[in-house]
């Protein structure tokens, strides 16, 4: 899968919508990893829509789009982190109660800190590009030299974009779009491979429980053995009530 333009970013958004439609077809028959995937897809899709809206006018590339690259990187890190753990149910419990994942450990006993996840992500895809994207995208969250470089100058009362780091504005803007595209590409890759395997394992577990408990419906099995999203709803609503 290769993305090059905003149109390709639109295509990735459409692929995410296809993923979401598959989950809608399942109704309430969700597994713990499904709850996380749906949350990530909804957030990623909204970020893509906002980024496209803010960057489609080549004459007025809105700098408000820049922090969205870091937010999408956040989606990628959360998605990938969840494929590295032994107990996804426990991680989901951490997720719905709003606790930080940093202290949660993966299968090898390493804490899920961002620096570690970036390194693992680079190993997975055989490139250091995500380390570079993460560092640069983080600069967009706060006022930094990135914003100073793209500040506007006035010429006869009309705003004029300055050149950036010896590149013209259009080249710089294309670089930003490329970063967002690469993040989307990696996210979709993980959803299509790692999460496909996770869902397969979940279905195998469900199949085993069906044989062991033939009198129970699928939803009763999922609720009883902690595979359904109802458990997470209960925890989440309890958390919301505690904040009132």
Where are these regions (language model features)?
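A cross-kingdom marker of C-terminal helix-rich interaction/assembly modules
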Residues: 1-69, 74-244
């Amino acid at each position: 899968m290769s993305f090059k333009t905003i149109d390709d970013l639109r295509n990735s958004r459409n692929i995410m919508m296809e993923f979401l439609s598959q989950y809608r077809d399942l109704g309430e028959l969700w597994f713990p990893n499904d709850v996380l995937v749906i949350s990530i897809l909804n957030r990623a899709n909204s970020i893509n829509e906002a980024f496209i809206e803010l960057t489609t006018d080549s004459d007025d590339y809105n700098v408000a789009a820049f922090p969205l690259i870091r937010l999408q990187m956040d989606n990628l890190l959360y998605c990938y982190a969840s494929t590295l753990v032994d107990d996804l149910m426990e991680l989901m419990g951490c997720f719905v109660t709003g606790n930080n994942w940093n202290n949660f450990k993966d299968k090898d006993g390493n804490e899920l800190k961002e620096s570690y996840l970036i390194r693992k992500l680079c190993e997975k895809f055989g490139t250091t590009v995500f380390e570079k994207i993460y560092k640069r995208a983080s600069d967009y969250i706060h006022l930094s030299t990135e914003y100073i470089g793209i500040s506007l100058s006035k010429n006869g009362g009309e705003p004029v974009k300055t050149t950036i780091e010896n590149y013209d504005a259009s080249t710089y803007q294309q670089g930003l779009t490329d970063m967002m595209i690469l993040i989307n590409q990696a996210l979709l890759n993980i959803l299509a491979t790692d999460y496909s395997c996770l869902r397969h394992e979940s279905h195998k577990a469900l199949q085993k429980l069906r044989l062991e408990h033939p009198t129970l419906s699928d939803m009763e099995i999922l609720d009883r053995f902690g595979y359904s999203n109802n458990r997470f709803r209960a925890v989440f609503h309890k958390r919301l009530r505690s904040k009132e």
